[in-house]
């Protein structure tokens, strides 16, 4: 995957032979400087393509760790490569002025069903471009995010559990163990 993407993104932490391990890091720091597009923007846009957002800013601040699992087949890896290449083109559209620096598919990602189905659509791109940026998404399907953006850093520092009290999980539970010998 890193070889397929090397002309589109800076790949960090290559070995002496120019190879990467089973995961690789896309360095978005230069893109961030020139366009304002962040690693979070790219991660959120991947959700519009139907992919789980990758690890952000670890081990490289401003990077994305792409770590496909062994259970992914070649077709799925190829779709992710295509998604990342299409996202790179969306970034180029910002670089060239074809897309606005603040009101674009990356800055507004992910696109929730609620937003897509709203009567109000004040974006310079179509709902189709937002929700189905690649043709194969119609066939493959995807899970739409239910929440667009949150303040991730605030949430990380101010975690509040909204779970029921632990005692709610133990009501009606018989903790005796019966063993037949």
Regions found by a protein language model. Name each.
Residues 2-181:
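Non-catalytic terminal extensions of PLP-dependent enzymes
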């Amino acid at each position: 995957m890193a070889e397929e993407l090397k002309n589109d993104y800076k790949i960090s932490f290559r070995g002496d032979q120019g190879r990467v391990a089973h995961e690789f890091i896309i360095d978005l720091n230069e893109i961030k400087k020139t366009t304002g597009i962040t690693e979070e923007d790219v991660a959120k846009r991947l959700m519009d393509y139907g992919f789980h957002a990758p690890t952000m800013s670890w081990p490289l601040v401003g990077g994305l760790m792409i770590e496909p699992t062994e259970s992914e087949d070649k077709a799925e890896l190829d779709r992710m490569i295509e998604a990342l290449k299409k996202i790179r083109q969306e970034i180029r559209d910002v670089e060239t002025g074809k897309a606005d620096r603040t009101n674009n598919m990356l800055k507004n990602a992910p696109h929730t069903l609620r937003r897509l189905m709203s009567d109000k659509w004040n974006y310079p791109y179509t709902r189709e471009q937002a929700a189905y940026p690649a043709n194969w998404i119609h066939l493959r399907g995807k899970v739409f995010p239910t929440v667009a953006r949150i303040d991730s850093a605030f949430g990380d520092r101010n975690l509040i559990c909204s779970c029921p009290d632990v005692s709610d999980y133990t009501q009606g539970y018989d903790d005796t163990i019966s063993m037949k010998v």
